């Protein structure tokens, strides 16, 4: 199940960003963006409580949040947020979320593969509305399309639970 909600006044933009490029085995770039992690326990707990209440899934923890900036041409190809094995504490990523922090950019649409026969496409596109949050199972394939103008700013996160 995919949830869509609006979260405001929780985040502040980090001061420094790192190269967030991710490549696959063949060297092809899967993600091009700048990132920073937010480990503020109060913010993480507030987000955890909102999503835990919204999803009604047995969740036990949240990873540090990731702030990302995508400039013109940046994207993140199709991927899932799950790992092959549980973490050392036995937990796995159960729920992912993405919050758009601005709406003064073009492109950078967020797609989730649904394979739902109700849609003509195999995926559903979520338009970039400021502070709207998409909450979805971490095993679902998703992507960020290339940004065409401006800078796309977002917070993403992953909530954990038992397999």
Short names for language-model regions:
Residues 1-59, 66, 75:
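Non-heme Fe(II)/2-oxoglutarate
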């Amino acid at each position: 199940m995919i949830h869509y909600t609006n979260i405001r006044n929780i985040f502040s933009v980090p001061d420094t960003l790192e190269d967030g490029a991710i490549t696959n085995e063949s060297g092809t770039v899967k993600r091009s963006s700048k990132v920073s992690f937010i480990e503020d326990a109060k913010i993480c707990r507030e987000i955890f409580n909102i999503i835990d209440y919204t999803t009604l899934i047995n969740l036990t923890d949240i990873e540090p949040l990731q702030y990302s900036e995508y400039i013109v041409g940046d994207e993140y190809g199709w991927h899932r947020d799950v790992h092959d094995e549980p973490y050392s504490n036995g937990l796995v990523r159960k729920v992912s979320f993405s919050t758009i922090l601005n709406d003064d950019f073009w492109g950078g649409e967020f797609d989730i593969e649904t394979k739902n026969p109700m849609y003509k496409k195999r995926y559903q596109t979520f338009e970039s509305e400021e502070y709207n949050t998409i909450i979805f199972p971490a095993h679902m394939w998703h992507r960020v399309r290339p940004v065409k103008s401006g800078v796309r700013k977002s917070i993403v996160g992953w909530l954990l639970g038992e397999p």
